[in-house]
Amino acid sequence: KADRDKPMNIEADALKHDDQKQLTIFNGKVHMTKGTMVLKAARMEVQQDNKGHQIAKLSAEPGERIFFRQKREGLDEYSEGEVETAVYNSQEDTLTLTTRAELRLLRGTVVADRIQGQQIVLNNTTEVFMVDGKANAATGASGSQRVRATLTPRAKTNETAPTATGTPLKPSQRIGNDKP
């Protein structure tokens, strides 16, 4: 959530900008950061509307995948993964991963959960993600598979304090034995 209003910083081997269309194309070893979000791809097209909202379309080299990583709000946890194509929408604060999508949830540095599908949509505002195993005809993705997930239970914590038993303590000004 905190990343939503952060600036988008991009490095690449080459850049082409069309001011008329408000379209910027980055090619070659693209590295984008936006707050704690990191995206690495071969190519990225950023379209900006007149309100400043950005849509970034990322693609990998043939046979390769894009890498992404983002810290989860208020936790020592990260979402990371790989995919062939991705679209980041700054207005909706969503990241859509399409074709051979894999999402890993890390607790600290340990992979806790792993989710795979043809399309994964992450909503950073609501912290909800949806996974689909079917190919998306709109993106030209081929093939279909079942969604696969490995989910690790969270460590148990004491959510409530133990209930007090016995006689409550009373304040005293004396220390020691009160017996005669």
Task: Please state what every model-predicted region is.
Residues 1-180:
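Mature-chain termini and adjacent capping regions
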